[in-house]
Every structure is written in structure tokens, then in C-alpha cells.
A protein has these predicted regions:
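Feature of secretome-associated and extracellular-like proteins
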Residues: 357-391
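Carbohydrate-recognition loop of C-type lectin domains
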Residues: 105-228
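Extended, beta-strand-rich, solvent-exposed assembly scaffolds of outer structural proteins
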Residues: 223, 299-353
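An aromatic-glycine-centered, glycine-rich loop/turn in mixed alpha/beta architecture
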Residues: 69, 74-76, 207-298, 304-305
Length: 391
């Protein structure tokens, strides 16, 4: 760059505004007095652009000669929803992150250094946890593992992960290898029956329900529940539901844990699903349930799993009676104490949803749920059930 370079500089100033600086004749071309400068720019919708799956081609299609075809068809397929959009950093957030970023001194040594640099590289980070390879089983020395939960998405795309790691390598010291891994998301689902005094309010059950959902979401937004090393406190959640409206007398709320996994389609695989929380072994009904999926042995109908006699069984539903028909009485083991599922030699050809993921649900031994290390705790309000009853 020299004094003739046609460049300009963009700085952020007060009140979240931007300032354009032209060259001074040494760094960039200097503008003449009274020169007229026209500026055009694109703005984004920030976080409002997240979660988009359907896209339409709105451009102009031309061949190398600049000629457009008289008729053409475009088909845009999105494998994942858009993510990563973020609002401008607030002054409060800058005051919080700036000292941490300065403390790294542009090198990644401690866990705090890695966190500050990753948040700088990828601002749309909801939560992050870093641990050394020596804590892995088996140990992987010389590696640093980074589990990152993005905002408005469960996982990062492979392209985004590669971009973050490539940028992070500029700050890593010695021969340490950074590894960015997906979080293991542990979902907590609630089934709540809310009883309220109809003589104290003219609100309908649906209005009471909406108030409860709003109260629960507000609590989750301000508590340390949804995060790595998060803890779900049952008594606090019951209190939040009761306090959602003065007319509420009580609530009966049950807790279910859920994990989603993505099978390797058309391959015989061993699957292990760890919940890190013990299961309620003394239930009369099965502790384990799943969404439907398909396997090579039974490709024409959905199959499900549940636990019986400490074993995982594979079954289908009778199309007429709806009764469970056992197809295999032993496809894996369930460890109620460790909170683990192990399924052997499954060849899955189709999952439950559009992205082929499969959901498994279990009843926990304790209603207080914890998440450790790379496990991210997420209270899934959208898939929870809240029903209000007038007394």
C-alpha cells in the first residue's frame, strides 16, 4: 500500500456507529478538498437471518458472452439451516470481553486464552468449554479439545469448524494441536400439568399456559442452566411454574432426558449413547423409548427400541392393534447406574427426521440433571408439554 492506493478505512465509533477514513497520501490516496464521495453498502438482518432453510435464486444467469438463456430452472438445496448471524456487540459485552482478549496477548496457552480467541474468531458462540487431551479416555497428549455450542444452532458446519481451527492455529504455541469437536447435547423435556384457581382470574387455560412458557423461558435466559457444566434444578423449575401467575395453585411436572444421534446409514455400526445421569430402574414401564427408524432387516416399516430385563429390544407396532411386536430381544445393553445405552451391530438405513437423526428418551433417577465437560444442557421448551387446568 502506498500513497496512490485507492483504499479507505472503516472504524467503529461511539453509539455503535461507523466512521469512514480516507487515505492521507502516505497510506492510501488523499482526497482533494470538496471532493464528493458516494458510499453504498449492504447490511444484514443479524440474528434474524438464522434458521433459514429455503432459498430462491434471484440473480441473473448469463453465459460467458453475457447472453441470458430464454428459459432455465434453478434448484437450490440447503443441507443445513443458516446460522452465525449476530447483532453488533453491546458496550456491556465489549467491557466484559476486552480484558480477556487483551490478556491472551495473541497466544493460546491457558483455557481462558483459547476461549477468548475462539469467541473473537467466531462471535456467534453461545458457550464453549476447553479441556486437555490428557483428560480423554484413552489420553491424547499434545491436543486441546474445544467443544463449542453456536447460537441458534446445535452444531457447527464442517466448513465453519475448519475455518475456526485454521485461524486458531495462528495463536497456538509449541506443538499443541487444537481439535474442535461437536457438543454432546443433553435435552431436558418437561411434562407439566398446571392447576389454577378460576375464581382469581378470567384467563383461559391457554393464556395461563402461555404465561408459564414465558416464565420458564425467561428463567432459562437468565440462569446458568443451559450451558456446558449446566445444572437443571427441579425445585427451582417447579417454583418458576408456580410463580408464572398468582392464580396458579400447584403443578405436577415430570422430567425426561433426550439425546439425538446421527446414524451412519447403510453401515453396520456400534452405537453408544451416554446421558451422564442415572436412569430410574424401578419403573414399571420401560425407561427407554425412541423415535421410529428403519434397518436393513425390516426396511418396509419403522422400528423402535425400549428396555426389558436390562436389555435393549427392537420392536414394531402392529398396524391394526397398535401392540408392540418384538423383533429382536437383545440388540444391546442398558446401564441404569452409569446412564449409558449400547447398541450392537445395527445397520440403519433411514432415521426419524429429514436429517436422519434418531431421538432416544429415558426417565432419570433424579429430577435434578447435570452436564459435565463436553455435554451441553438444553431445556427443550418447544418439545415440552404444558397443560393448564381450571379448578
Amino acid at each position: 500500500m502506498d500513497g496512490a492506493s485507492k483504499v479507505f478505512f472503516l472504524d467503529e465509533i461511539e453509539d455503535q456507529r461507523y466512521e469512514i477514513l480516507m487515505g492521507d497520501g502516505v497510506l492510501g490516496k488523499k482526497q482533494e478538498n470538496n471532493a464528493r464521495i458516494e458510499v453504498s453498502y449492504l447490511t444484514t438482518a443479524g440474528s434474524e437471518s438464522n434458521g433459514v432453510r429455503t432459498f430462491v435464486f434471484s440473480g441473473v444467469l448469463e453465459n460467458p458472452n453475457g447472453v441470458s438463456p430464454s428459459a432455465f430452472t434453478t434448484n437450490i438445496t440447503s443441507t443445513t439451516a443458516s446460522a452465525g448471524g449476530e447483532e453488533i456487540e453491546s458496550t456491556q459485552k465489549i467491557k466484559y470481553t476486552a480484558p480477556k482478549a487483551y490478556g491472551t496477548q495473541d497466544r493460546a496457552v491457558t483455557a481462558d486464552d483459547y476461549e477468548a480467541i475462539v469467541r473473537q474468531v467466531y462471535p456467534a458462540t453461545s458457550d464453549i468449554i476447553i479441556f486437555g487431551g490428557e483428560d480423554q479416555e484413552p489420553p491424547e497428549y499434545g491436543k486441546v479439545f474445544i467443544a463449542l455450542k453456536p447460537k441458534d444452532a446445535s452444531y457447527l458446519t464442517s466448513l465453519t469448524k475448519k475455518s475456526i481451527v485454521d485461524e486458531l492455529k495462528k495463536f497456538v504455541v509449541a506443538s499443541v494441536e487444537p481439535r474442535l469437536i461437536d457438543p454432546s447435547i443433553l435435552f431436558v423435556e418437561l411434562t407439566s400439568k398446571i392447576y389454577y384457581n378460576g375464581s382469581m382470574t378470567d384467563q383461559t387455560p391457554s393464556q395461563i399456559r402461555d404465561k408459564v412458557i414465558g416464565g420458564v423461558q425467561s428463567y432459562l435466559d437468565t440462569s446458568d442452566t443451559e450451558k456446558f457444566n449446566g445444572k437443571f434444578r427441579y425445585s427451582k423449575m417447579v417454583g418458576v411454574i408456580d410463580d408464572a401467575d398468582k392464580s396458579i395453585n400447584s403443578n405436577l411436572t415430570s422430567v425426561t432426558m433426550r439425546k439425538d444421534f446421527y446414524p451412519s446409514l447403510n453401515s453396520t455400526f456400534y452405537y453408544e449413547v451416554c446421558f451422564q445421569n442415572a436412569f430410574d430402574e424401578d419403573c414399571d414401564d420401560p425407561v427407554l423409548s425412541s423415535t421410529g427408524f428403519r434397518v436393513t432387516e425390516y426396511p418396509n416399516f419403522d422400528v423402535y427400541v425400549e428396555d426389558r430385563n436390562k436389555k435393549i429390544v427392537l420392536y414394531r407396532l402392529d398396524s391394526v392393534t397398535g401392540e408392540k411386536v418384538v423383533l429382536d430381544s437383545d440388540i444391546g445393553d442398558i446401564d441404569y447406574v452409569k446412564g449409558e445405552l449400547k447398541m450392537y451391530n445395527l445397520t440403519i438405513i433411514k432415521g426419524s427426521f429429514f436429517d436422519n437423526r434418531i431421538s432416544v428418551r429415558v426417565k432419570p433417577l433424579s429430577n435434578d440433571i447435570k452436564a459435565l465437560r463436553e455435554v451441553y444442557l438444553d431445556v427443550d421448551v418447544a418439545n415440552s408439554s404444558f397443560t393448564a387446568y381450571k379448578e
